Swiss-Prot record:
The keyword NAD does not apply. The lineage of its organism: Eukaryota, Viridiplantae, Streptophyta, Embryophyta, Tracheophyta. Residues 160-186, 232-242 have a biased composition (Polar residues). GO terms for molecular function: proton motive force dependent protein transmembrane transporter activity. This is Sec-independent protein translocase protein TATB, chloroplastic. InterPro entries: TatA/B/E (IPR003369), TatA/E (IPR006312). Keywords: Chloroplast, Membrane, Plastid, Protein transport, Thylakoid, Transit peptide, Translocation, Transmembrane, Transmembrane helix, Transport.
């Protein structure tokens, strides 16, 4: 081997950069014409992340450009705002629709596919009124349900409040009897004024007075049997004392006089 035809062996050097966390490797090749080429490869450090098949290429430093979406919202100035719109029909995206179209072409052919499309269009036109009727019925059903639910929600609190008010303002039987018997106002002196009718305040005052009178009568009725029992308990000891006390003895002078006579 001559030095002109000899090829120098490639030398590799490994440099570690602790701050950057990367390792750089340089390969140099020498030719007899003193023409050298240096290739630099940079391998990023793996770090503490797991080496999974999804992020393996990213960890090794190989990156691919992301594919651009099909549709973009373009602003007034012609700049893309980053919003993406993916067209879909009945949950079928654009690539799936392309696959379905290719399969349909292979199965039916161009003429058969055109006939199938025409038949589908006719059937859809025929079913349009039925679909509209179904939509109208569903809307009416929803509206009726919402109305019934709203009415129930409104009536339930009204009924509860009305029942609570009735419970709180139920008059006593004596008050109801008085209202049924007489509907005229009564003066404190006992005179009846037929010209005046009961007002709410007077009605409340009368009911309060009647309640007080009923309570006083009940107290008197309960107190009277207690007093009778107390008197009965007090009387027997007096009779016993009268029975136990002996009659008074006569003096001796009175007892001796009849004997002398």
């Amino acid at each position: 081997m001559t030095p002109s035809l000899a090829i120098a062996s490639s030398t590799s050097t490994m440099l570690l950069c602790p701050k950057l966390g990367t390792c750089s490797m340089s390969l140099s090749t020498c030719t007899p014409t003193s023409h050298s080429k240096i290739h630099h490869f940079h391998l990023y450090s793996l770090g503490k992340r797991l080496f999974t098949p999804w992020n393996g290429f990213k960890q090794l430093g190989f990156s691919t450009k992301p594919k651009k979406p099909l549709f973009h919202f373009i602003g007034k100035k012609g700049r893309c705002k980053g919003k993406v719109v993916y067209a879909s029909l009945f949950g079928v995206g654009a690539p799936e629709a392309l696959v379905i179209g290719v399969v349909a072409l292979l199965v039916f052919g161009p003429k058969g596919l055109a006939e199938v499309a025409r038949n589908l269009g006719k059937t859809l036109r025929e079913f349009q009124p039925t679909i509209r009727e179904i939509q109208d019925v569903s809307r009416e059903f929803k509206s009726t349900l919402e109305r019934e639910i709203g009415i129930d929600d409104i009536t339930n609190p009204l009924q509860s409040t009305y029942s609570s008010n009735v419970r709180n303002t139920t008059p006593t039987p004596s008050a109801t009897e008085i209202t049924n018997n007489s509907q005229t106002a009564v003066d404190p002196n006992g005179k009846v004024d037929e010209s005046k009718a009961y007002s709410s305040e007077e009605y409340l005052k009368i009911t309060e007075e009647q309640l007080k009178a009923v309570a006083a009568q009940q107290q008197e009725q309960t107190s009277s049997p207690k007093e009778d029992e107390i008197e009965q308990q007090i009387q027997p000891p007096a009779n016993e004392t009268a029975a136990t006390v002996p009659p008074p003895q006569k003096p001796e002078s009175e007892s001796s006089l009849p004997s002398d006579l």
